[in-house]
């Protein structure tokens, strides 16, 4: 309806008071790879309980992250968080953070990181490997290329599909 009328009703997250942190997540684990950040975003979404009154979803205030997150790390964190109903998040030390009513406090340590990796580990043979949801960045394409450079994969290795935009593909091809 909004596309047809050109109007958007002011509701939900369009109200400033609705965009306040309601969950505190203290990160004590060492996160380096984009996959680690994806695991973090996925993890706090899975911690939600019926007792939490978060009609618009968990909106965590995350502390303990490095101040120099890469584009790939930020993308991995936010994409995974969105998959589990988190419409937005705040990172301590990054921008202005409004005061919010914190309903729960969680700690994400090495044990939580390892346990979530184990839960998500394939339990059967992998038939296809996909990268790029959301679309792979140039940095992610470079990382895949670096991992595969000089490797000879077995004939029965599953196919690898990398999804990206035409612009990122062009940059990756041009820059090697």
What is the meaning of each model-derived region?
Residues 2-166:
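Intrinsically disordered, low-complexity segments enriched in small residues
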Residues 168-170:
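Short gly/pro/ser/thr-enriched loop/turn and capping motifs at secondary-structure boundaries
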Residues 174-176:
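Thiamine diphosphate
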């Amino acid at each position: 309806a909004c596309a047809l009328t050109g109007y958007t009703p002011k509701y939900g997250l369009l109200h400033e008071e609705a965009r306040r942190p309601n969950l505190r997540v203290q990160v004590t684990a060492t996160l380096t790879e984009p996959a680690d950040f994806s695991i973090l975003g996925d993890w706090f979404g899975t911690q939600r309980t019926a007792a939490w009154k978060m009609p618009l979803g968990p909106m965590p205030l995350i502390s303990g992250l490095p101040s120099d997150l890469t584009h790939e790390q930020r993308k991995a964190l936010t994409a995974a968080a969105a998959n589990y109903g988190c419409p937005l998040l705040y990172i301590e030390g990054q921008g202005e953070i409004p005061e919010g009513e914190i309903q729960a406090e969680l700690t994400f340590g090495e044990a939580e990181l390892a346990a979530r990796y184990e839960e998500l580990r394939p339990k059967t043979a992998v038939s296809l490997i996909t990268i790029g949801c959301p679309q792979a960045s140039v940095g992610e394409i470079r990382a895949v290329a670096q991992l595969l450079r000089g490797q000879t994969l077995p004939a029965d290795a599953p196919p690898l599909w990398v999804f990206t935009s035409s612009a990122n593909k062009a940059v990756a091809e041009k820059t090697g």
